[in-house]
Structure formats: C-alpha cells, structure tokens
C-alpha cells in the first residue's frame, strides 16, 4: 500500500493544533490547475501560505512544485502569498541540491523532524 507523506504531515499538524485546509486546487495564470497539500489562512501575523509535502524531495519534485507555484503566485490576488515545502527527512537527510534550489527561490523548507517545533510558530494563525 502506497503511503503519502502528506497524510503523516496532516497527523502531525493536527497534534500541534495547527489549522489548515487540505488538498486545495488553485488555477494559475496559465489556466492550469495546481494542487497544494495544505493551505494556511492569512492572519494578522502571516500571509496566506501554500504548502507542499512531496513524497520525494529531489530535482523532479523541485521542478514540479516550482512550476505550479510560479504559475499560482503570478496572479495579483496571491502576490503576498508564500510557499512552504515540508521535506521528509525521517529516513534520509533532505537532498542538498533540492534544498538549495527551494531556498534560492525564496521557499521556506521545513524538515519533518523540525515540524513539531516550527509548525506552531510558522504555520499557525
């Protein structure tokens, strides 16, 4: 049976009492629809945050996620939105090349091992 990392992330977010909308579809300026694993609502402290929790954290994931994000954020309504990627480091460290690529694009990366510590600060309203 295939396990989805996003399901494990959802369980951890629930245990941290972080509220989110799961499986959000957003149409980009290309007219393609892009799926995001989680949406964290805008608040007085944070902009709207879109979040991906990919099963793999590699070059292909970077390309897939960044195309969808670039297309999504070009909409003027989402100009101030941010992207967060939660990486699965439970069995192996996050791939350095993918980590660097996301950071070079201004994407916040949260390793799963740090999620319990960082979620209440960075993802809660």
What is the predicted function of each stretch?
Residues 1, 7-11, 15, 59-125:
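Charged, structured surface patches that assemble and position nucleic-acid processing machinery
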Residues 10-30:
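A short acidic/basic microdomain associated with nuclease active sites
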Residues 32-35:
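A short, glycine/Asx- and small/polar-enriched loop/turn
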Residues 39-50:
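Active-site beta-strand-loop-beta-strand hairpin of nuclease catalytic cores
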Residues 53-58:
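Glycine-rich phosphate-binding "P-loop"
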């Amino acid at each position: 049976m295939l396990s989805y990392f996003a399901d494990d992330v959802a369980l951890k977010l629930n245990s941290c009492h972080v509220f989110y909308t799961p499986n959000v579809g957003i149409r980009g300026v290309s007219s393609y629809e892009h799926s995001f694993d989680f949406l964290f609502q805008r608040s007085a402290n944070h902009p709207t945050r879109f979040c991906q929790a990919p099963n793999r954290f590699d070059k292909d994931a970077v390309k897939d996620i960044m195309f969808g994000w670039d297309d999504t954020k070009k909409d003027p309504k989402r100009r101030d939105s941010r992207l967060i990627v939660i990486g699965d480091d439970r069995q192996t460290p996050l791939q350095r090349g993918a980590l660097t690529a996301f950071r070079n694009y201004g994407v916040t990366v949260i390793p799963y091992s740090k999620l319990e510590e960082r979620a209440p600060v960075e993802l809660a309203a």
